[in-house]
UniProtKB/Swiss-Prot annotation:
Residue stretches in coiled coil: none
InterPro entries the UniProt entry points to: Crust_neurhormone_H (IPR005558)
Name this polypeptide is given: CHH precursor-related peptide
Stretches for region Disordered: 18-38
Protein localization: Secreted
Keywords: Hormone, Neuropeptide, Secreted
Molecular function terms from GO: hormone activity
Chief place where the protein resides: secreted
GO CC terms of this entry: extracellular region
Expression sites (tissue/organ): Produced by the medulla terminalis X-organ in the eyestalks and transported to the sinus gland where it is stored and released.
Superkingdom: Eukaryota
Amino acid sequence: RSAQGMGKMERLLASYRGALEPSTPLGDLSGSLGHPVE
């Protein structure tokens, strides 16, 4: 996979997770990038 493609997917997952958990701090969302989102 290309690094760019992975970055897009990570941002997508972070946005999706943020939508599910609106109370999650932005710092936590940023920290979750680069790690598997369960």
